[in-house]
């Protein structure tokens, strides 16, 4: 057992230690709000080139670490990255987002989805994660991530981002057997992919079921929860010590169900008060979040006050400070810096405010 004080703060929080301040990182902390990222994007305009070339992905992952020293450094990648390795091709078009052609809508297409071999299909993952671990040492935890089965199925079936999810719901409610077959294959492949990330150096992994908030509770229980559980059970069987985070956008209606997924930490969006989230999830599930990314357009005093309010509600145990969603493009970089500086000084700020 490694001495606790030498472990990254984020791991200590995930294990339930009482800390003087919560660890902090931001979803999409490497991205368009940073000038260094925009400069690199101008030079390498293809998203897949940036995320699948080790040197570029390492550099991008480390940009916010060098600038702000967050307690977590997340792999720069995309939830769709492993899909081609299962026989589901995609591309990301600047300003349009992901395109998956042809969309998957028949039993024959689902039957053609095959097992993922991450070393072969995503060979860039190992050098990226190994290098990130070397670069950050114990100063931060390295996070891996993947998309959850429902959300990946939604992309594959819609063929692109959607506001209505009409195609996947059509399949769910008229031919559920086909959808369940796809969800099962995705769950097993995502478990393989997350275990591979852990083998390569990820110390914490987050499952993004970004679109599961679009489901009614009864449909969440049918199409989302069982497959989240299937992923987490397989990862826990191989890596019982690795903290698992589940994030859903618009999750207020299914919060308790998220706690049944097998995750250790529920990442909460800003529509739920953290005191309420604690009450609804119980003492054994950690919380991550949950500041509205729009707060970072406010004054620095406003940002500080919101951070203090959030941390007081969360308490000093099993909480990772984060936004409730990814940081927005156009966010002033100085305000992101202020967010991290405030978070890193919370022990003094909390003491001074009592």
Curated annotation (Swiss-Prot):
Which GO molecular function terms does the record list?
Answer: uroporphyrinogen decarboxylase activity
Q: Pathway, according to UniProt?
A: Porphyrin-containing compound metabolism; protoporphyrin-IX biosynthesis; coproporphyrinogen-III from 5-aminolevulinate: step 4/4
Q: GO BP, one example? A: protoporphyrinogen IX biosynthetic process
Its taxonomic placement starts with: Bacteria, Bacillati, Cyanobacteriota, Cyanophyceae, Synechococcales
Q: State if Nucleotide-binding is listed as a keyword.
A: no
Q: Is Coiled coil one of the keywords? A: no
Which compartment or compartments is the protein found in? Cytoplasm
Q: Which organism is it from?
A: Synechococcus elongatus (strain ATCC 33912 / PCC 7942 / FACHB-805)
Q: So what family is this one in?
A: Belongs to the uroporphyrinogen decarboxylase family.
Transmembrane region(s): none
Q: What is this protein called?
A: Uroporphyrinogen decarboxylase
- The superkingdom listed in its UniProt entry is Bacteria
Annotated positions binding substrate? 28-32, 47, 78, 155, 210, 325
User: Which UniProt keywords are listed?
Assistant: Cytoplasm, Decarboxylase, Lyase, Porphyrin biosynthesis
């Amino acid at each position: 057992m490694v001495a606790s004080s030498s472990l990254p703060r984020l791991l200590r929080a995930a294990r339930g230690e009482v800390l003087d301040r919560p660890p902090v990182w931001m979803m999409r902390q490497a991205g368009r709000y940073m000038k260094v990222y925009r400069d690199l994007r101008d030079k390498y305009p293809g998203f897949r080139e940036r995320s699948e070339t080790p040197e570029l992905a390492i550099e991008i992952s480390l940009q916010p670490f060098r600038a702000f020293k967050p307690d977590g450094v997340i792999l720069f990648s995309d939830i769709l990255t492993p899909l081609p390795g299962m026989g589901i091709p995609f591309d990301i078009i600047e300003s349009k987002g992901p395109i998956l052609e042809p969309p998957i809508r028949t039993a024959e297409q689902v039957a053609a989805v095959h097992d993922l071999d991450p070393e072969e299909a995503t060979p860039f993952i190992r050098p990226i994660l190994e290098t990130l671990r070397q670069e950050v040492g114990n100063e931060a935890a390295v996070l891996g991530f993947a998309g959850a089965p429902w959300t990946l199925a939604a992309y594959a079936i819609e063929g692109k981002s959607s506001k209505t999810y009409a195609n996947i719901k059509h399949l769910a409610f008229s031919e559920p057997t086909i959808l369940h077959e796809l969800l099962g294959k995705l769950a097993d492949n995502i478990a393989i992919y997350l275990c591979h990330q852990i083998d390569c150096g990820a110390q914490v992994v987050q499952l993004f079921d970004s679109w599961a908030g679009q489901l009614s509770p009864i449909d969440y229980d049918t199409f989302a929860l069982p497959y989240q559980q299937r992923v987490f059970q397989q990862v826990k069987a191989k890596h019982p010590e690795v903290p698992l985070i589940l994030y859903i956008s618009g999750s207020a209606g299914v919060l308790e169900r998220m706690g049944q997924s097998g995750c250790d930490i529920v990442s909460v969006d800003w529509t739920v008060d953290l005191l309420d989230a604690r009450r609804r999830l119980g003492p054994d599930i950690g919380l991550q979040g949950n500041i509205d990314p729009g707060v970072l357009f406010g004054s620095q005093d406003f940002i500080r006050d919101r951070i203090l309010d959030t941390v007081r509600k969360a308490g000093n145990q099993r909480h990772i400070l984060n936004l409730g969603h990814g940081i927005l493009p156009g966010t002033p970089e100085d305000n992101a810096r202020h967010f991290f500086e405030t978070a890193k000084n919370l022990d003094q700020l909390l003491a001074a405010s009592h």
